[in-house]
Amino acid sequence: TKSRSNSGNWWVQHIGTSTASKMLNLQATSAETDKSGNGTLSRPTATVFGTNHTDGLGTNGETHIAYCWHSVEGYSKFGFFEGNNDDDGAFIYTGFRPRLVFIKNIDATNRWIVHDSARRTFNPMNLPLDWDESYGEYTSASRQIDFLSNGFKCRTSDASINGSNTYVYGAWGDVPFKYNNTF
């Protein structure tokens, strides 16, 4: 969510943050940030999400924009996982082969890592993009994941995607099992 009336940041609410008052800055590498001092926040429901007054959000007379996503069986999945700090990393079940995955460490300062199968069609996925940076893709042996038929697996102990921390993720399906004509 972002105020279009000022130059504030993009703020992210995610089901995987530790409390409803914690938000993530899409333009920064910072860990989750407590925004309870800026007004009340609550977890989004199926029909409602709320904002507080962080960076002008919720201010009367301002124009806002928000992108709202939720898990849809066989199409998209959003959640969190605990990294295992091992090169044989965490496996995250999505129910489909991913087309695009984002991962963000919420316990420590790290980038928003994004992998997709449009630019890299085979494993390991090692051409990430960073949502919080303006540069393009780069080759990275330290931020590799594998796209599997039913989810994705981290193939590194790098703290940005699989250290001993909590991570939020979002994934969209390539050829979802339930809706095989999605993409």
Residue spans of the language-model regions?
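Surface-exposed molecular-recognition determinants
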Residues: 1-183
